[in-house]
Swiss-Prot record:
Localization per Swiss-Prot or TrEMBL: Secreted
Signal peptide annotation: 1-21
Organism field: Aspergillus terreus (strain NIH 2624 / FGSC A1156)
Name of protein: Probable glucan 1,3-beta-glucosidase A
InterPro entries, sorted: Glyco_hydro_5, Glycoside_hydrolase_SF, Glycosyl_hydrolase_5
E.C. designation(s): 3.2.1.58
UniProt similarity note: Belongs to the glycosyl hydrolase 5 (cellulase A) family.
Molecular functions per Gene Ontology: glucan exo-1,3-beta-glucosidase activity; metal ion binding
Disulphide bridges: 290-415, 316-341
Gene3D superfamilies in alphabetical order: Glycosidases
């Protein structure tokens, strides 16, 4: 198919580019990306340098049941054993070839999550380090492939959302004690490493998914964002701060900090984590995302990138809701059952019925059209270890469910 042909053509340049990349060491900044005028089209490299059980279930299946996030994984296994296993994961889950495949698909960005503990773990933390060397390498590979990088502080001290993807599942304790100052310190060190020196890193994200509806104090969050903005703008006029809307949507942030440059809002849009959304038909999903583009993205006074979204319309992917936790869709979490999870749990999108594949393609196309009403998008995620239909962009591209070229449409004009 066209995507695989494009990969093959681009692969001819990999050896030469690899040789060039080997000599790159984050030198003086030269180029930028204009988030005000250019369209972001990219993908996240989740589950690599910050663990998530559903993206790399094999790591967790080989660990005791109490390992449900990176904190407990390293705590239970011990640092020596955990680091040995994680090095094996870091070496293989994402490689240089992935960056060339992403570029071959027509994308211009990757967003790379990293935890605060990779920069500087706190006393008493069980985490292991070593991730920054891989992030350095990833930035070199991205540059060789012609991609821009958003460095994403995905986990903050105390957990900013209580999700396993923050490093520690459970209560939100970000904002308590010294956690805000500790986050500023981690962010500053991350910025010092990449903002002044890499022409590949065009933006850095203050913190991933601070959960305002879950209890994060909005005033404290705004104070932190201001400090992060000052750190970045003092280091370089060519790098933007990315900040999450905190799950309160983009338009309430109009006028915050600056509407005139060096700042980008990150909105995450999923329609799978609520039973009412799971009940919706594909027509409903299409209308929903198109309406969101018109009412929340287009009127925003800053650039807004939908920095996480999916082709899935169920929450059936194994461990998506947490290790050992079932899905809402089939009633395993309690309450009504919308349908059978079946082939949506694990494996390839090619295992789905033709109708399910068509509906997923239609939903993906509608989202692409909606998100490009503003500043673009970053799909979650590039790959999964054991397959998660609808979430694995590489699998979606390989099976023609994600458009290639990105502008191609089987269902044009869905957003009017």
């Amino acid at each position: 198919m066209l995507y695989n042909l494009s990969k093959a053509v681009l692969a001819l340049s990999v050896l030469a580019a690899s040789a060039d990349a080997a000599g790159i060491r984050l030198e003086k900044r030269a180029s930028t990306f204009d988030y005000e005028t250019e369209m972001v089209r990219g993908v996240c490299l989740g589950g690599w340098l910050v663990l998530e059980p559903w993206l790399s279930p094999g790591l967790f299946d080989a660990a005791p049941d109490g390992a449900v996030d990176e904190w407990t994984y390293t705590e239970i296994l011990g640092q020596d054993e955990a680091k040995a296993r994680l090095i094996g994961h870091w070496d293989t889950f994402i490689t240089e070839q992935d960056f060339f495949d992403i570029a071959a698909a027509g994308m211009n960005h990757v967003r790379i999550p990293i935890g605060y503990w990779a920069v500087e773990a706190l006393p008493g933390d069980p985490y292991v380090d070593g991730q920054l060397e891989y992030l350095d390498r990833a930035i070199e590979w991205a540059g060789a492939a012609g991609l821009k990088v958003i460095v994403d502080l995905h986990g903050a001290p105390g957990s900013q959302n209580g999700f396993d993807n923050s490093g520690r599942k459970g209560a939100i304790q970000w904002g308590q004690g010294d956690t805000l100052g500790q986050t500023v310190n981690a962010f500053r060190k991350l910025a010092e490493r990449y903002v002044p020196s890499s022409d590949v890193v065009t933006a850095i994200e203050a913190v991933n998914e601070p959960f305002i509806p879950g209890g994060v104090n909005e005033d404290q969050l705004k104070e932190y964002y201001q400090q992060a903005y000052d750190i970045v703008t003092q280091m370089s006029p060519d790098v933007d701060l990315v900040f999450s809307d905190g799950f309160i949507n983009p338009t309430p942030w109009n006028g915050f900090i600056s509407d005139s440059g060096n700042i980008v809002m990150d909105n995450h849009h999923y329609e799978v984590f609520d039973i009412n959304l799971l009940r919706m038909s594909v027509d409903d999903h299409v209308r929903s995302v198109c309406d969101f583009g018109r009412t929340q993205l287009a009127p925003a006074t800053k650039p807004v990138v939908v920095g996480e979204w999916t082709g899935a319309m169920t929450d059936c992917a194994r461990y998506l809701n947490g290790r050992g936790v079932g899905a809402r869709y089939d009633g395993a979490m309690g309450g009504e059952s919308v349908g059978d999870c079946g082939p949506f749990i694990q494996g390839s999108v090619s295992d789905l019925s033709p109708d399910d594949q068509k509906n997923m393609r239609r939903f993906i196309e509608a989202q692409l059209d909606a998100w490009e009403m503003k500043s673009g998008w970053l799909f979650w995620n590039w790959k999964t270890e054991q397959g998660a239909p609808g979430w694995d962009m590489k699998d979606l591209l390989d099976n023609g469910v994600f458009p290639f070229p990105l502008e191609s449409r089987k269902y044009p004009g869905q957003c009017g």
